[in-house]
């Protein structure tokens, strides 16, 4: 009955009349990019390479993740892939409306299938993931490579001649990676300047099988390195693409380097390093807000990012050692309304990808910082603000945090600091006493992180270095006491208990006693 009056769920993917329509389908400028105009669907979306990887890996459940702008081409791509892998018993699925963001692999949706292989279409942030094998298919945008070289050389002439910069590092957006060979050949024609290229390395079959490098890390998909024999401070950065999160991340992680961006749409060059100090000033302001916070919320931006799980565990342990209260949240895509529901949280820490890990919007009620900034804030007033070390790489932050933890354990004096001392807040301009939260039902010890007095008898009392009693607070009760509205008036013990009476019965349009 339902088939006669409704369209089947798989109508758009399996209807036989689509064969003739999709047989000669071509990719247009509105689909995968203007560089793919005139190409077939198979060529523009790398169907042959995708099928080859599926067959070599013997994958059976394949997720095809499309951003919103590429959904019109999803049916054509799905049918082209499915017809070539059906004989192996494999099944492909179209994934849309990503849980977190289009730039990251949607691992959560893949786990719902569950999928053992994911094809990611469109723009990508290139943050490594170790949850499942991923194959990236980038957009294809047009680029006049010769014009780009001439414009960038003319704009950065003063930095190369006057400032003593000896090298150039060329970085491009993923939508121009299909022209990588042309970019290398054209940019390397000037032999008087040393040039290195931040090439994109797509995951190989070895990395798809879950293999890691000799250090136990998931290999990076792109690394920005100076030319051989030079330091990074000796180089000028050239970026090919439009302004966005990817460019801003490059700008902040290399704050000491001149950065010039070439916009292919306008064929113009702009110096971005002049605005770097303003961006870093915002991050420094958020850092000082974190110094005054006692309750933190750890936001999981994407569950499939490499090093995200051990980093979350490390951040929770660091906050616990500092007597800070932490909550772990997974809210999908961020917006001010979602985070406003957690009013007791004073500062959020976003564990995210290379492009979505920084939130500078003023619409959020509380500050949102990065894991690197949190580790710096936990050092207290003794921290050293070093913009050249600012990073969104989760693996780097995890390594530094683990090394700092080892030093703290080796130096016993740091674990016996005076946590009840006053500190000055640069944000509010007032003196404050740091809150110390208790964990569990007993007294928390710094030596072995165990709880004492589980049976209700507390034979040991926590004291600070001056041998005075230390006050341990509860995050929930402290926040409730500070609120003006604490709920309806309870009136405990103020009213006599009333006798239970029979209430109304019936429906709203006519109760029993009204008839």
UniProtKB/Swiss-Prot annotation:
The keyword ATP-binding is assigned to this record: no
Say where the protein is mainly found.
Answer: cytoplasm
Keyword Transmembrane helix part of the UniProt annotation: no
Q: How is the cofactor bound?
A: Binds 1 [4Fe-4S] cluster per subunit. The cluster facilitates the reduction of the catalytic iron-sulfur cluster in the DPH1 subunit.
Q: Name one GO cellular component term.
A: 2-(3-amino-3-carboxypropyl)histidine synthase complex
User: Which InterPro entries is this protein grouped with?
Assistant: DHP2, DPH1/DPH2, DPH1/DPH2_1, DPH1/DPH2_3
Q: Could you cite one Gene Ontology molecular function of this protein? A: 2-(3-amino-3-carboxypropyl)histidine synthase activity
Sites where the protein binds [4Fe-4S] cluster: 104, 125, 353
- Region listing for Disordered, in residue ranges: 493-515
Q: In which pathway does it act?
A: Protein modification; peptidyl-diphthamide biosynthesis
Q: What is this protein called?
A: 2-(3-amino-3-carboxypropyl)histidine synthase subunit 2
- What is the organism field in this record? Cryptococcus neoformans var. neoformans serotype D (strain JEC21 / ATCC MYA-565) (Filobasidiella neoformans)
Q: What is the lineage of its organism?
A: Eukaryota, Fungi, Dikarya, Basidiomycota, Agaricomycotina
């Amino acid at each position: 009955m339902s088939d006669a009056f409704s369209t089947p769920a798989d109508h758009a993917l399996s209807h036989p009349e689509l064969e003739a329509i999709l047989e000669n389908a071509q990719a247009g400028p509105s689909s995968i990019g203007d560089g793919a105009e005139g190409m077939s669907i198979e060529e523009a979306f790398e169907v042959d390479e995708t099928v080859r990887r599926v067959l070599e890996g013997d994958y059976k459940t394949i997720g095809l993740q499309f951003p919103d702008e590429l959904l019109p081409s999803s049916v054509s791509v799905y049918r082209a892939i499915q017809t070539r892998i059906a004989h192996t018993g494999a099944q492909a699925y179209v994934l849309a409306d990503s849980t977190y963001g289009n730039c990251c692999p949607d691992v959560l949706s893949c786990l719902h299938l569950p999928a053992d292989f994911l094809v990611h279409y469109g723009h990508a942030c290139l943050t490594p993931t170790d949850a499942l094998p991923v194959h990236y298919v980038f957009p294809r945008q047009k680029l006049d490579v010769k014009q780009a070289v001439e414009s960038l050389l003319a704009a950065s002439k003063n930095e190369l001649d006057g400032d003593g910069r000896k090298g150039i590092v060329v970085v491009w957006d993923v939508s121009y990676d299909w022209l990588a060979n042309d970019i290398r050949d054209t940019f390397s024609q000037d032999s008087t300047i040393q040039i290195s290229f931040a090439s994109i390395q797509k995951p190989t079959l070895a990395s798809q099988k879950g293999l890691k490098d000799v250090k136990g890390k998931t290999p990076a998909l792109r690394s920005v390195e100076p030319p051989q024999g030079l330091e990074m401070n000796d180089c000028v950065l050239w970026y090919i693409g439009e302004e966005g999160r990817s460019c801003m991340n490059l700008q902040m992680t290399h704050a000491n380097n001149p950065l010039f961006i070439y916009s292919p749409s306008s064929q113009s060059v702009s110096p971005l390093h002049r605005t770097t100090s303003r961006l870093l000033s915002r991050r420094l302001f958020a850092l000082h807000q974190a110094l005054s916070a006692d309750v933190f919320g750890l936001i999981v931006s994407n569950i499939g990012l490499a090093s995200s799980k051990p980093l979350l565990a490390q951040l929770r342990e660091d906050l616990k050692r500092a007597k800070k209260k932490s909550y772990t949240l997974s809210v999908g895509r961020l917006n001010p309304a979602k985070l406003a529901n957690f009013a007791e949280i004073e500062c959020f820490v976003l564990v995210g990808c290379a492009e979505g890990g920084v939130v500078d919007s003023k619409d959020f009620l509380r500050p949102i910082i990065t894991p690197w900034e949190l580790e710096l804030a936990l050092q207290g007033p003794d921290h050293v603000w070093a913009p050249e070390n600012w990073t969104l790489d989760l693996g780097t932050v995890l390594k530094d945090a683990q090394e700092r933890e080892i030093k703290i354990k080796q130096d016993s004096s740091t674990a016996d600091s005076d946590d009840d001392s006053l500190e000055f807040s640069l944000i509010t301009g007032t003196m404050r006493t740091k809150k110390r939260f208790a964990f569990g039902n007993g007294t928390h010890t710094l030596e072995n992180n165990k709880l004492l007095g589980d049976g209700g008898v507390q034979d040991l009392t926590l004291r600070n270095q001056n041998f005075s009693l230390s006050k341990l607070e509860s995050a929930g009760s402290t926040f409730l006491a500070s609120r003006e509205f604490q709920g309806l008036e309870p009136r405990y013990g103020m009213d006599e208990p009333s006798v239970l009476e029979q209430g109304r019965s019936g429906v709203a349009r006519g109760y029993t006693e009204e008839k």
